[in-house]
Every structure is written in C-alpha cells, then in structure tokens.
C-alpha cells in the first residue's frame, strides 16, 4: 500500500473511533481497496462516474451519491444502468455537488433533477424517493 492510502485508512479509523459518519471521496480506488474502506466504516461515496462503477459500489454495500451539478453531471450515466439492472435504489441519492448559482437560476435545483429522472422514464414516486428520501 502507498502512504496516501494508508493515511486514508487511518483517517477512517479515527473518524469511526469518534463515532462520526465516514463519507467517501474515492475516485480512483480499486475494488479491493473499496471493500477495505467499506469494512473499515465508510458508508457513502460520491465518486462514481459511470454505471459500472456505481453498480460495483452498490453491490459492495455502499450508499451511492450520484453527482448532478455544474461540474460533474453523472445522473444519466450512473442511474440508467442501475435502473436497467433492476437494482434496489434505496441506497442511491442524487446530490448537487458544485452547483453554480447561475445554473440554479437557469435550470432549477431539485426540480431539475426530478424532471431529468422523469425524462429518463423513472416513475414519479421512485424519482421522489431517490432525490428526497434516500
């Protein structure tokens, strides 16, 4: 293991020891590293950039937070494969990471995400569950 990864694992251990929630930011971890981080206490991650990555994280037990902001727009690329695979979406959330004010004014905020999911064929109740409940 490299020193940076060892430091990540130590920070997870420290966070768990303080009875805090461990939120993930792990864009370049291998599957064994993901499994190790989940076993150490990580419970969410918002670094899946495609459907295969999102599905792998879900199958490993991670709560997947799909980014749909101004910089990262991963909703369609990540959610559609999850839906096509018939996977449970109770551990899927959509987050507006790095959403610029001008984009909120132009497109909307939560409503834009729900409209996007509806345009993908997601039933309204499931879109509401993914966006607001999960």
Q: How does the language model describe each region?
A:
Residues 1-63:
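Hydrophobic, small-residue-rich alpha-helical packing segments that form membrane-like cores
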Residues 2-9, 48-51, 72, 104-111, ...:
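Electropositive phosphate-/nucleotide-binding environments in soluble metabolic enzymes
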Residues 7-9, 38-40, 80-84, 109-111:
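Short, solvent-exposed amphipathic alpha-helical segments in soluble enzyme
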Residues 17-20, 82-134:
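His/Asp/Glu-enriched, well-ordered alpha-helical/loop segment
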Residues 25-26, 45-46, 66-68, 94-96, ...:
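Active-site neighborhood of phospho(di)ester-bond hydrolases with catalytic His/Asp-centered motifs
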Residues 28, 67-76:
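Active-site glycine- and acidic-residue-rich loops that bind
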Residues 54-59, 75-78, 103-104:
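Short, charged, surface-exposed secondary-structure boundary motifs
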Residues 59, 63-71, 87-91, 105-107:
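Polyanionic/metal-chelating signatures
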